[in-house]
Amino acid sequence: MLQGKTIIVTGAASGIGAATAALVSSHGAEVISVDINIPRTPVGRFLQVDLADRSSIDRLVAALPSGAHGLANIAGLPPTRPAEAVLKVNLVGLKYLTTQLVPKLSDGASIVNLASLAGLGWAESKDAVLASADLDFNEVSAFCVQHGIAGGRSYFFSKEALIVWTMQNRWTWRSRGIRMNAVSPGPVDTPILKDFIATLGARAEEDMKTMDRPGKPSDIAPVVAFLLSDSSAWIRGTNVPVDGGMYSNVLCGIHGL
């Protein structure tokens, strides 16, 4: 379903990004792996980038070929990192890379953003999310102070804003057939799972008890691959939960179902 396509995967050095790069490659795609860290066994061509740095992103965009058929925005920082860094990488840098790269993408390309179950409460943060629409790298520190975004809250906010941005761009590039969707994993057994447990404490332990098991990167990658493929051409601006039923569990609790 991806035979002959060129797919750019950020965060390809580990976890869900590495699993996605390997999977789409196995389906015949030419992969360009992107990360700040050098993968032990890179899939396809590797390019290094710091998504917290505008100039680094500019260099990446210049180095990437024209005509790519897909962009999987999977790179991200966990909630234990400084709030400013989390927002720069998970939101501002991701958005900047995407908008700069769109002119070089092939018509009919697919963009898939890795959001999170942590972004479920975006509606309660709507004012701050809307205020972040044009947030630039040099404005992140002041924005965090103004909106009280500190500690682990930065991760939740970055994913809330990413889900909203995905929905807002449901038709932005429709004239070229370029679509955008998001995937929201629940807890996944990756190198940063311990960071979530450290941040959420008892809440994380309770979620683990509710779930039969944490997810695996191999649970998430096939959904990303599907959204990158032509089989998902009629899916636009959608956030797909891949969380073992946790999203439905939360909704049932909220609505007494």
State where each predicted segment sits.
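Rossmann-fold cofactor-recognition segment
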Residues: 41-55
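Short, small/polar-rich loop/turn modules that mediate ligand/substrate recognition or access, typified
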Residues: 174, 179, 235-237
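Catalytic loop of short-chain dehydrogenase/reductase
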Residues: 78-79, 84, 107-175, 187-188
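Conserved glycine-rich cofactor-binding loop
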Residues: 6, 13-14
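Short, flexible catalytic-loop segment of classical short-chain dehydrogenase/reductase
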Residues: 120, 184-195, 248
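C-terminal helical subdomain
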Residues: 96, 154-155, 160-163, 182, ...
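Short C-terminal tail/terminal secondary-structure segment
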Residues: 236-257
